[in-house]
Amino acid sequence: MLISVCIPTYNRPKSLLNCLNSLSLQTDLDFEVCISDNCSHENIERIIDPYRKKLNIKFNKNKENLGAALNFLKVASMAKSEFIWFLGDDDLLFPNAIKELKSLININKDCDFFWINS
């Protein structure tokens, strides 16, 4: 697997739902999704479960709130792919986003880092 999409989240189930929906509509589904919940009061796993059939999801719920920076590091540590794409739980992707990113990676084989700002 080439890409891990890493999503730190905290108490934003509606935003995460929309983000996961946009990921499930990708034209290329060969990627993993890593989600680290920073001890939300909401049942975030309930939001994730319906997407497990279509997406390769890894989920972590912190036992206590670690703060944004440590939750960011936690979700990164879950990734097993060559490249990590950090998404906010409120980010939405066009359906061809993963496919386009893979094309960029394949064209620029000597790059170790891509900055995407949309």
Q: Where are the language model's segments positioned?
A:
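Nucleotide-sugar donor-binding/catalytic module of glycosyltransferases
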Residues: M1-S118
